C-alpha cells in the first residue's frame, strides 16, 4: 500500500536502529483518512472470505480493526485485553504473549461470550515482528472452536520470523507494508 509506505518514510522514526515509531499516525495519534484506506485495503485483500468477527489486541489494533469492520459489513470487533480487570468476565479464553517492545510476558484474555464455535475470525493488528501477539490471538480463536481465516497486518517487519510462525499454523497473512531492513538507519521495503 503505497500511501502507507510513504507515510512511514515521511513521518516514521527509527529508535535504536530497530524500533519503528509511527505514533504520530498509527498508534498514539491516529490519521483517520489513512485508517480508512487501510480498512479498504484489508477488505480488498480478504474479499470473498466470510468474516463473522474481527479480533485484535488492545490498544493499537482497536482503531484499525474498528475502521476495517465497516468494509466487512460492520461485523463485531473483539479485542483481547492485556490486563486482568473486574469488568472482564471470569469465563475467558486466555493465551500468554511476549512483548518484544515492552520486554515482558502478559496474558491476553477474551470473554467466552464474544467468540463462538464455527465463527470465522479475521485477526487484525498494527505490527507483525516475532508473531507472538498474532499467535496468541490464533490460540484464543482455536480455544473458542472458531476458525482463524486470516491475519491482516498494517506493518510487517519481514526480516523477523512472525510471518513464518503464523503460516506454520496454516493461516494466510496479508501485510500492507513489509519492511525488509532498517539498514543504514533507514526503512527499506520489500
Swiss-Prot record:
Pfam families: Pribosyltran. This is Xanthine phosphoribosyltransferase. It comes from Laribacter hongkongensis (strain HLHK9). Keywords: Cytoplasm, Glycosyltransferase, Purine salvage, Transferase. Converts the preformed base xanthine, a product of nucleic acid breakdown, to xanthosine 5'-monophosphate (XMP), so it can be reused for RNA or DNA synthesis. Gene3D superfamilies: 3.40.50.2020. The keyword Cytoplasm applies. Coiled coil: none annotated. One of its GO terms (biological process) is purine ribonucleoside salvage. It is an enzyme of class 2 (transferase). It catalyses: XMP + diphosphate = xanthine + 5-phospho-alpha-D-ribose 1-diphosphate. Pathway: Purine metabolism; XMP biosynthesis via salvage pathway; XMP from xanthine: step 1/1. Homodimer. The gene is xpt. It is found in: Cytoplasm. Its EC number is 2.4.2.22. GO terms for molecular function: xanthine phosphoribosyltransferase activity. One of its GO terms (cellular component) is cytoplasm. Xanthine binds at residues 20, 27, 157. InterPro entries: PRibTrfase_dom, PRTase-like, Pur/Pyrimidine_PRTase, Xanthine_PRibTrfase. 5-phospho-alpha-D-ribose 1-diphosphate binds at residues 129-133. The keyword RNA-binding does not apply. Belongs to the purine/pyrimidine phosphoribosyltransferase family. Xpt subfamily.
Amino acid at each position: 500500500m503505497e500511501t502507507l509506505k510513504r507515510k512511514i518514510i515521511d513521518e516514521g522514526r527509527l529508535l535504536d536502529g530497530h524500533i519503528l515509531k509511527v505514533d504520530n499516525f498509527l498508534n498514539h495519534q491516529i490519521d483517520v483518512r489513512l485508517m480508512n484506506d487501510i480498512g479498504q485495503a484489508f477488505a480488498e485483500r480478504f474479499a470473498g472470505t466470510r468474516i463473522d468477527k474481527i479480533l485484535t489486541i488492545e490498544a493499537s489494533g482497536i482503531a484499525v480493526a474498528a475502521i476495517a469492520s465497516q468494509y466487512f459489513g460492520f461485523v463485531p470487533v473483539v479485542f483481547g485485553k492485556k490486563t486482568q480487570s473486574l469488568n472482564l468476565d471470569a469465563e475467558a479464553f486466555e493465551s500468554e504473549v511476549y512483548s518484544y517492545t515492552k520486554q515482558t510476558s502478559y496474558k491476553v484474555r477474551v470473554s467466552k461470550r464474544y467468540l463462538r464455535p464455527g465463527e470465522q475470525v479475521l485477526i487484525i493488528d498494527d505490527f507483525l515482528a516475532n508473531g507472538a501477539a498474532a499467535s496468541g490471538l490464533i490460540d484464543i480463536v482455536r480455544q473458542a472452536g472458531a476458525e482463524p481465516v486470516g491475519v491482516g497486518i498494517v506493518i510487517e517487519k519481514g526480516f523477523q520470523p512472525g510471518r513464518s510462525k503464523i503460516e506454520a499454523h496454516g493461516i494466510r497473512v496479508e501485510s500492507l507494508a513489509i519492511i525488509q531492513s532498517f539498514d543504514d538507519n533507514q526503512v527499506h521495503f520489500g
